[in-house]
């Protein structure tokens, strides 16, 4: 490997779909690699077979690609450091576990889960932090071997634990948080590096993989801080150099003020959910990049290449990042407004079809009608899924008039405007936005009613709303029959 060549990785477990927090981890590693002309590795940590879900790996990869995050090495892009799934690396871990056993840096432990639980309960009752207490304390090598043989004869399967040195400080200069240190006696005692089924634990496999894949920097979430001293124990046991670590701040839900938790249903947290609602990938990329990292200056809208160019890990924040759904909507709206018509058309039409508002295989007339409808709302949409609710009046029976709307129609001029409008549009030879606008102007000219008193009654009567997109095109899309029906209904309600 070239000297100082940066290699980073994103190493998800296929136990669920791509979470916002995990997407941020992937994104920051990607930006760090691209900014420094390094290598970005995708590695699947699938040793927790009980929690893996069928499409977990596919979901991770599909959604990373959707966000615009591409990797240089991974399960689908093999390199010289593979395999890139931990489940395919068992033959790599086994001899290394054995090496530690042979050097007496690790040992087999036969304590059952029940015994370990009882030990923890006793410690808790004494007000002590739970920790593993060495089960062979005071025993000779011969006595230990005898105890292990007897346990094996009973059919018990061992775990392998690594020896944690006593009263030793493990510290590192964290890229985000600065100096962090742990006393070895506070990390829970000798910890498991191989489970009873022969699979390595996370804190062992991750060290082996990072070392053999020559990972130089590990950027990950704040929840991994407590894992780092354990991993440093493993690095030390093998005499390997550890990479640089950086632990990114927590993400806080602005609605609750609490840490973003997968159990928190007050906010959508998975990339799939935002895709389904019609958020744009570039907008999500932009928003997520600002969760715990800030550019120089006041601007917040940047494209991917701009983020790559200016990304500096020193600007990763120590303070919690605020997940603000309103800000995400604002950012996405900026991207919707700037996007090409075809992109928004395709995404919005899918939303209308999914909601059953438009047939699954629309004909040319329906597509053209939908194109005009979507264009009408493009500037207002925070995400394309909003088209379904925003354009509800075009698909469903008109809603009951609000009290504010009724007040607007209380002026006697409203009835004059609506009767004139209904009479004139009924016989329009061409029912389109131009002719509708000309009709409104002619009413103004003939009645001398203008401004809000002219336009608001027509908007309320036809669209049943007080606010919305441009009026004449909206009425054109409603169609003559529906517009006249709404006008008649409104006039009846006014009487």
From Swiss-Prot:
<comment type="subunit">
    <text>Monomer.</text>
</comment>
<dbReference type="GO" id="GO:0008270">
    <property type="term" value="F:zinc ion binding"/>
</dbReference>
<dbReference type="InterPro" id="IPR014729">
    <property type="entry name" value="Rossmann-like_a/b/a_fold"/>
</dbReference>
<keyword id="KW-0030">Aminoacyl-tRNA synthetase</keyword>
<keyword id="KW-0648">Protein biosynthesis</keyword>
<dbReference type="InterPro" id="IPR020751">
    <property type="entry name" value="aa-tRNA-synth_I_codon-bd_sub2"/>
</dbReference>
<dbReference type="GO" id="GO:0000049">
    <property type="term" value="F:tRNA binding"/>
</dbReference>
<dbReference type="GO" id="GO:0005524">
    <property type="term" value="F:ATP binding"/>
</dbReference>
<dbReference type="GO" id="GO:0004818">
    <property type="term" value="F:glutamate-tRNA ligase activity"/>
</dbReference>
<protein>
    <recommendedName>
        <fullName>Glutamate--tRNA ligase</fullName>
        <ecNumber>6.1.1.17</ecNumber>
    </recommendedName>
</protein>
<dbReference type="InterPro" id="IPR004527">
    <property type="entry name" value="Glu-tRNA-ligase_bac/mito"/>
</dbReference>
<comment type="similarity">
    <text>Belongs to the class-I aminoacyl-tRNA synthetase family. Glutamate--tRNA ligase type 1 subfamily.</text>
</comment>
<keyword id="KW-0436">Ligase</keyword>
<feature type="short sequence motif" description="'KMSKS' region">
    <location>
        <begin position="259"/>
        <end position="263"/>
    </location>
</feature>
<dbReference type="InterPro" id="IPR033910">
    <property type="entry name" value="GluRS_core"/>
</dbReference>
<dbReference type="GO" id="GO:0006424">
    <property type="term" value="P:glutamyl-tRNA aminoacylation"/>
</dbReference>
<dbReference type="InterPro" id="IPR008925">
    <property type="entry name" value="aa_tRNA-synth_I_cd-bd_sf"/>
</dbReference>
<comment type="function">
    <text>Catalyzes the attachment of glutamate to tRNA(Glu) in a two-step reaction: glutamate is first activated by ATP to form Glu-AMP and then transferred to the acceptor end of tRNA(Glu).</text>
</comment>
<keyword id="KW-0067">ATP-binding</keyword>
<dbReference type="Pfam" id="PF00749">
    <property type="entry name" value="tRNA-synt_1c"/>
</dbReference>
<feature type="binding site">
    <location>
        <position position="262"/>
    </location>
    <ligand>
        <name>ATP</name>
    </ligand>
</feature>
<dbReference type="InterPro" id="IPR001412">
    <property type="entry name" value="aa-tRNA-synth_I_CS"/>
</dbReference>
<dbReference type="GO" id="GO:0005829">
    <property type="term" value="C:cytosol"/>
</dbReference>
<dbReference type="InterPro" id="IPR045462">
    <property type="entry name" value="aa-tRNA-synth_I_cd-bd"/>
</dbReference>
<dbReference type="Pfam" id="PF19269">
    <property type="entry name" value="Anticodon_2"/>
</dbReference>
<dbReference type="InterPro" id="IPR000924">
    <property type="entry name" value="Glu/Gln-tRNA-synth"/>
</dbReference>
<dbReference type="InterPro" id="IPR049940">
    <property type="entry name" value="GluQ/Sye"/>
</dbReference>
<keyword id="KW-0963">Cytoplasm</keyword>
<feature type="short sequence motif" description="'HIGH' region">
    <location>
        <begin position="12"/>
        <end position="22"/>
    </location>
</feature>
<keyword id="KW-0547">Nucleotide-binding</keyword>
<dbReference type="InterPro" id="IPR020058">
    <property type="entry name" value="Glu/Gln-tRNA-synth_Ib_cat-dom"/>
</dbReference>
């Amino acid at each position: 490997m070239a000297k100082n060549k940066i290699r980073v990785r994103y190493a998800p477990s296929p136990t669920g779909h791509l979470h916002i927090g995990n997407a941020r981890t992937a994104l920051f590693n990607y930006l760090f690699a691209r900014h420094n002309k390094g290598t970005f590795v995708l590695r699947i940590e699938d040793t927790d077979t009980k929690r893996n879900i069928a499409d977990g790996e596919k979901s991770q990869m599909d959604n990373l690609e959707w966000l615009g995050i591409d990797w240089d090495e991974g399960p689908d892009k093999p390199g010289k450091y593979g395999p890139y799934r931990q489940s395919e690396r068992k033959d790599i871990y086994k001899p290394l576990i054995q090496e530690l056993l042979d050097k007496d840096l690790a040992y087999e432990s036969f304590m059952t889960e029940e015994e370990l639980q009882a030990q923890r309960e006793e410690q808790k009752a004494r007000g002590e932090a739970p920790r593993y207490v060495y089960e062979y304390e005071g025993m000779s090598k011969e006595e230990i071997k005898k105890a292990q043989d007897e346990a094996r004869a009973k059919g018990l399967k061992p775990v392998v634990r690594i020896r944690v040195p006593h009263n030793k400080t493990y510290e590192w200069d964290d890229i985000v948080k600065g100096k962090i240190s742990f006393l070895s006696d506070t990390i829970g005692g000798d910890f498991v590096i191989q489970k009873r089924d022969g699979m390595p634990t996370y804190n062992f496999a991750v060290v082996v993989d990072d070392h053999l894949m020559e990972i130089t920097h590990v950027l990950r979430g704040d929840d991994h801080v407590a894992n780092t001293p354990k991993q440093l124990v493993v690095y030390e046991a093998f005499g390997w150099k550890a990479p640089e670590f950086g632990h990114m701040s927590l993400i806080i839900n602005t609605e609750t003020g609490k840490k973003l938790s997968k159990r928190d249903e007050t906010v959508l947290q998975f990339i799939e959910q935002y895709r389904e609602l019609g958020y744009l990938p570039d907008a999500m990329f932009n928003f997520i990049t600002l969760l715990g990292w800030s550019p120089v200056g006041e601007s917040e809208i940047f494209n991917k290449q701009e983020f790559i160019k200016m990304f500096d890990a020193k600007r990763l924040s120590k303070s919690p990042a605020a997940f603000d759904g309103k800000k995400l909507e604002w950012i996405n709206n900026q991207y919707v407004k700037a996007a090409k018509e075809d992109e928004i058309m395709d995404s919005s039409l899918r939303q209308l079809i999914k909601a059953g508002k438009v047939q699954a295989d629309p004909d040319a007339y329906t597509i053209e009608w939908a194109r005009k409808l979507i264009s009408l709302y493009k500037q207002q949409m925070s995400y394309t899924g909003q088209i379904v609710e925003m354009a509800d009046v075009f698909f469903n029976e008109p809603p009951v008039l609000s009290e504010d709307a009724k007040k607007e129609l209380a002026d006697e001029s409203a009835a004059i405007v609506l009767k004139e409008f209904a009479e004139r549009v009924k016989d329009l030879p061409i029912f389109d936005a131009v002719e509708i606008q000309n009709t409104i102007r002619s009413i103004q000219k003939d009645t001398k009613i203008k401004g809000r008193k002219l336009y608001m009654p027509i908007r309320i009567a036809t669209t049943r709303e007080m606010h919305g997109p441009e009026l004449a095109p909206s009425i054109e899309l409603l169609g003559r029959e529906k517009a006249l029906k709404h006008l008649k209904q409104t006039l009846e309600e006014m009487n």
